[in-house]
Amino acid sequence: MKMRPLKGLQEKNPTDVIVKDPINITEIKVPVKWFLEKIENKELLLCRTEKCNIWPPDKMSRFIELIYLNIPIDHIYLSERKGRNYDIMSGVHMVRTMYHFYESKFFLTKLEHVYGISGLAYFQLGNNLRNKFLDYKINMKLFRGNQK
């Protein structure tokens, strides 16, 4: 079906994308605790209402299992705003899952490869397992605008 412009509007066919300001993209690895600190300091905001789309507990558990297996996770994309605050461009489910696990808002279920922690929440883990989670490095791409 061909799209027709609204009455009185002319159809435009841009041939080039115009970039307003240069974008600086930095690829870095940061520990899980970096994200948690930013959330706690309100420098990285998550949707906190019940209406937020969240993964089911078994999917969140499988994601946490990847961390304990030390399997690389896809990049999380953030954009930096003025004042060292950040917006999540891509990866909000992953960040929210890490935070919910840290806050012990769910118990690990249906783990296939990691034994001994199924049925537990973060607060029930020993210090070694807590530190392993907090120190796991996440691939992140940080988008910064022109730093004038």
Segments predicted by a language model, with ranges:
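Basic- and aromatic-enriched surface patches that contact anionic nucleotides/nucleic acids
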Residues: 2-9, 13-28, 48-148
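A structured, charge-rich N-terminal accessory region that forms the first stable segment of a protein
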Residues: 38-41, 45, 50
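Flexible hinge/switch segments at interdomain interfaces of large molecular machines
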Residues: 31-39
